[in-house]
Amino acid sequence: MASDPMSVNSSAREPPAPPGSGADEPKYGGYTRFELELEFVQALGNPLYLNHLASRKLLSNPAFIAYLDYLQYWSRPPYLKYITYPGPTLKNLELLQQEKFRQDIISPDLVERLRLEGMKAGIDWHRESFPSTA
């Protein structure tokens, strides 16, 4: 098996086994495919990283687009529970399925808007989770 996730037809691959499943996953650079894909999918929660991917023309590469489609398994159990920030991560993963978004994310204005929305959501969550007692 090649270590490059885009070197094979991602849509035909099964998601990696989650930790504790007893599966003996091969390691790539010391990490399992589960760990590598988790790290990558979590990076998609960062609008600046999405802009970087767009600037490198990856978001117009059919193999990369197929890989993004394959990664949607992270939105379902049992994988969902491993994502640290599921809100922005899964929102961006869903948006990346749309060609218009993949084209528009090159815009610094969109990146900034997504960044500010993410910060606002984090602040709102904190206020709701830890209301002041004053």
Curated annotation (Swiss-Prot):
Gene Ontology terms for molecular function: transcription coregulator activity
GO BP, one annotated term: regulation of transcription by RNA polymerase II
InterPro entries: Med31_sf, Mediator_Med31
Compositionally biased spans, kind Polar residues: 1-12
Any GO CC annotation of this UniProt entry: core mediator complex
UniProt keyword annotations, A-Z: Activator, Nucleus, Transcription, Transcription regulation
Region (Disordered): 1-28
Residues in the signal sequence: none
One Pfam short name: Med31
Keyword Nucleus: yes
Compartments, as annotated in UniProt: Nucleus
Principal subcellular localisation of the protein: nucleus
Known function: Component of the Mediator complex, a coactivator involved in the regulated transcription of nearly all RNA polymerase II-dependent genes. Mediator functions as a bridge to convey information from gene-specific regulatory proteins to the basal RNA polymerase II transcription machinery. Mediator is recruited to promoters by direct interactions with regulatory proteins and serves as a scaffold for the assembly of a functional preinitiation complex with RNA polymerase II and the general transcription factors.
Family from the record: Belongs to the Mediator complex subunit 31 family.
Self-association state and partner proteins as the record states: Component of the Mediator complex.
Protein name: Mediator of RNA polymerase II transcription subunit 31
Species of provenance: Neurospora crassa (strain ATCC 24698 / 74-OR23-1A / CBS 708.71 / DSM 1257 / FGSC 987)
Gene: soh1
